[in-house]
A protein has these predicted regions:
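Conserved alpha/beta-domain cores
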Residues: 2-203, 208-210, 216-218
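Gly/Pro- and small hydrophobic-enriched strand-loop and loop-to-helix capping segments
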Residues: 113, 220-231
Length: 231
């Protein structure tokens, strides 16, 4: 952080978010220990979508640097100014990506978690080449096969992973899922881990405020936590 950045948040907001981050990080450490895993290899993505600027600035002032947004336009409206002050800031796109927003996403985000179709893969490959910029990519798998939810279907996941690697030359790092709200998340986390393992993928983006501890025990390397941090 540069000396010129002054967070626009009241002391109570700062104290609350500092405390929440401490609690979440402690739970991550305990879940990692319970799962015989290294907590330092698990990334906490603070989901800042729809959060007001004072709460985001409180998280920044508390030392957090990894954030997730659902919409490209929302990120474009507020993150450039923070990029100027925080060189180690990492932005993750965790919401569905329209192909016509791909260029803006590549320019704004460090990691894209929601690659799920050939047309988007082709667009990202072209943009990476054109802009000379590589971004970390996760493939979203619709583990619950929900019609209203984005993500490649499980039966198509292996073929899509292979196509992204061989046909499009994309740097596929791992897989992402959002389990159905009305089902236990554990089986979906385990299912995603199984798909990743057989495809030689080490990263798993899974787990949110209500279930990130379970996700860590089942192999999550990135958890997406919003309300447990921001309230």
């Amino acid at each position: 952080m540069t000396a010129t950045f002054e967070p626009n948040c009241d002391p109570g907001t700062l104290a609350s978010i500092q405390a929440n981050l401490g609690i979440v990080n402690a739970k991550i450490a305990q879940a990692a220990k319970d799962g015989a895993r290294d907590a330092s290899r698990i990334s906490l993505i603070a989901v800042s979508k729809v959060q007001p600027r004072p709460r985001i600035e409180a998280a920044l002032a508390a030392g957090h640097r990894v954030f997730g947004e659902n919409r490209v336009q929302e990120a474009e409206e507020r993150w450039p100014v923070y990029r100027e002050h925080f060189q180690d800031l990492q932005l993750h796109l965790i919401g569905p990506l329209q192909t016509n927003k791909a260029r803006a996403a590549v320019e704004m985000f460090d990691t894209i978690h929601t690659l799920d179709r050939p047309r988007l893969a082709a667009s990202l490959a072209r943009l990476f080449d054109e802009l000379g910029a590589q971004r970390t990519c996760y493939i979203q798998v619709n583990t619950g096969e929900e019609a209203q939810k984005a993500g490649v279907l499980p039966d198509n996941a292996d073929a899509f992973i292979a196509a992204c690697r061989r046909e499009y030359g994309l740097p596929i790092t791992g897989l992402m899922c959002i389990p159905p709200a009305d089902q236990l998340p554990g089986p979906h986390f385990a299912f995603l881990a199984e798909i990743a393992k057989r495809n030689g993928l080490e990263k798993l983006s899974m787990g949110m405020s209500a279930d990130y501890e379970d996700a860590i025990k089942l192999g999550a390397t990135a958890v997406r936590v919003g309300s447990a941090i921001f309230g």
